[in-house]
């Protein structure tokens, strides 16, 4: 017997993709594979019908029904980067139902949500005064792109605010944390 939740499956899949990208790219998008001279088709039907789908896992038990964790990566128009969405569909009545419901969720997510880049990796986001340093100020930024997912059309209303630690006293190391980012939509 084994038990899990949709949330845990999504966390596990997110870590799989992030921590083992070379294995993910090599194995999870294959439409079939051969082992011990036996050809096995991938039961993830979305791989055959949606070129943006690149995995992940099908399953079936009498208790859980037909299940599918699907991943899709699509370009963000005009943004210069792509976005990945995951779906976890559990308890459907058939293989085709799990594919249909997963595709609906992916299409809904891509059609109704946008990713906004608040800050670009390694670019100064702000400058702050520094005490007892050779320089009078320090530039603050982020070690990675800061991306936020919001409802379509609300991207212009998203704002980031860096709440810095006070006071900033030298010496400050590169990549040292000097504050907290607060993200607000309509001042909430």
Model feature map: region roles:
Residues 2-3, 7-188:
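Domain-terminus/edge residues, biased toward the C-terminal soluble/receptor-binding domains
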């Amino acid at each position: 017997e084994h038990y899990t939740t949709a949330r845990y499956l999504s966390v596990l899949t997110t870590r799989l993709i992030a921590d083992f990208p070379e294995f993910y790219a090599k194995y999870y998008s294959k439409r079939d594979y051969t082992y011990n001279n036996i050809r096995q088709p991938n039961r993830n039907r979305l791989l055959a019908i949606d070129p943006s789908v690149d995995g992940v896992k099908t399953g079936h038990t009498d208790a859980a029904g037909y299940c599918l964790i699907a991943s899709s990566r699509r370009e963000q128009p005009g943004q210069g980067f792509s976005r990945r969405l995951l779906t976890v569909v559990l308890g459907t009545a058939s293989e085709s139902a799990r594919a249909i419901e997963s595709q609906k969720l992916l299409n809904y997510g891509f059609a109704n949500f946008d990713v906004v880049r608040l800050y670009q990796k390694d670019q100064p986001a702000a400058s702050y005064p520094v005490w007892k340093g050779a320089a009078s100020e320090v530039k603050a930024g982020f070690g990675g792109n800061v991306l936020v997912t919001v409802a379509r059309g609300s991207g212009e209303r998203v704002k980031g605010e860096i709440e810095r630690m006070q006071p900033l006293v030298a010496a400050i190391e590169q990549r040292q944390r000097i504050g907290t980012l607060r993200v607000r939509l309509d001042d909430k």
